[in-house]
């Protein structure tokens, strides 16, 4: 088992290419959360904005691949489904210092919108990976 997810994989890739990365997420207060944070620190990623949720477990995914190389992914979002705009308000310094903000839709939509609006106000570029696919607000 390895820590991952779209955001985590992208953060590690950018750090390995020499970029400065602050990773914002929410994990459970469990072994998966602790292992993830340790991995990010070993990769040189700023973990100051990894929030811990004592009530919900870390998110997990099970990926199976069939004989035709088609995959099936089952996700239990766990604590990351509770990454709220109030958490991101605590990470405003990271948003302010960022050259680029990379997001995906594995966090609540109101949190995505909060970050996008905050980034817009601060004249920051945002890349949104719209996955998993779901309807987007016009705003």
Enumerate the predicted regions with their spans.
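Active-site alpha-helical elements of protease catalytic centers
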Residues: 4-22
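Loop/helix-junction capping segments adjacent to catalytic residues or to phosphate/diphosphate-binding pockets
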Residues: 4, 30-34, 82, 109-110, ...
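Conserved N-terminal subdomain of the carbohydrate kinase-like
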Residues: 16-99, 115
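Conserved beta-alpha-beta core of the PfkB/ribokinase-like small-molecule kinase fold
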Residues: 98-139
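Active-site nucleophile and cofactor-binding loops and adjacent substrate-binding regions
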Residues: 1-6, 51-55
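A generic secondary-structure micro-motif detector
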Residues: 1, 25-26, 105
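Short, acidic/turn-prone active-site loops that include or flank metal/cofactor-
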Residues: 1, 78-80, 130-133
């Amino acid at each position: 088992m390895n820590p991952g997810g779209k955001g985590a994989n992208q953060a590690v890739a950018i750090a390995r290419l020499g970029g400065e990365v602050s990773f914002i997420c929410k994990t459970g207060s469990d072994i998966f959360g602790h292992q993830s944070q340790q991995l990010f620190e070993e990769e040189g990623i700023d973990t100051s904005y990894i929030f811990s949720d004592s009530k919900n477990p870390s998110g997990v995914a099970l990926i199976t691949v069939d004989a035709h190389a088609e995959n099936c992914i089952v996700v239990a979002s766990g604590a990351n489904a509770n990454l709220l705009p109030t958490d991101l308000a605590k990470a405003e310094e990271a948003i302010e210092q960022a050259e680029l903000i990379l997001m995906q839709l594995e966090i609540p939509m109101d949190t995505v919108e909060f970050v996008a609006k905050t980034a817009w106000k601060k004249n920051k570029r945002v890349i949104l990976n719209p996955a998993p696919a779901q309807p987007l607000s016009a705003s």
